[in-house]
């Protein structure tokens, strides 16, 4: 099963590899990603934004699709964000999209463009 995650942070493993900044929050996401990616029947792809050029790389059995723009893109430019979401869908061809929060533009834009792909939306901290 191919799963595409939409997250609002750069995971530490990929940040270290790219020399990028990461957040101290979201530890539960990291543990969940490690557990899911250990299943040989699952291909996990994580989409997010960071302050660098477009990257499509794999680290420790997790594929990362990183779009340029960092924090600004999390909040603004919905047309470009929708294009990025479409590109991630084309690259990953997921069986399921899992959006971790809708407080930023990527989660909302993915909901609008994902078509017939089933979506799981997780909201935490209520």
Model feature map: region roles:
Residues 12-13, 72, 105-106:
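Short glycine-rich, flexible loops that bind phosphorylated cofactors or substrates
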Residues 53-59, 110-113:
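Short loop/helix-cap segments at secondary-structure boundaries that form the rim of catalytic
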């Amino acid at each position: 099963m191919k799963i595409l995650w939409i997250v609002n942070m750069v995971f530490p493993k990929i940040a270290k590899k790219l020399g990028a900044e990461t957040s101290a929050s979201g530890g539960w996401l990291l543990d969940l990603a490690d557990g899911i990616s250990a299943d040989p029947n699952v291909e996990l792809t994580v989409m997010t934004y960071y302050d660098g050029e477009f990257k499509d790389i794999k680290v420790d059995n997790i594929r990362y699709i990183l779009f340029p723009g960092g924090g600004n893109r999390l909040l603004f430019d919905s047309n470009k964000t929708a294009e990025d979401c479409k590109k991630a869908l084309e690259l990953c061809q997921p069986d399921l999209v899992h959006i971790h929060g809708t407080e930023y533009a990527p989660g909302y834009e993915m909901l609008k463009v994902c078509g017939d792909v089933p979506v799981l939306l997780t909201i935490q901290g209520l």
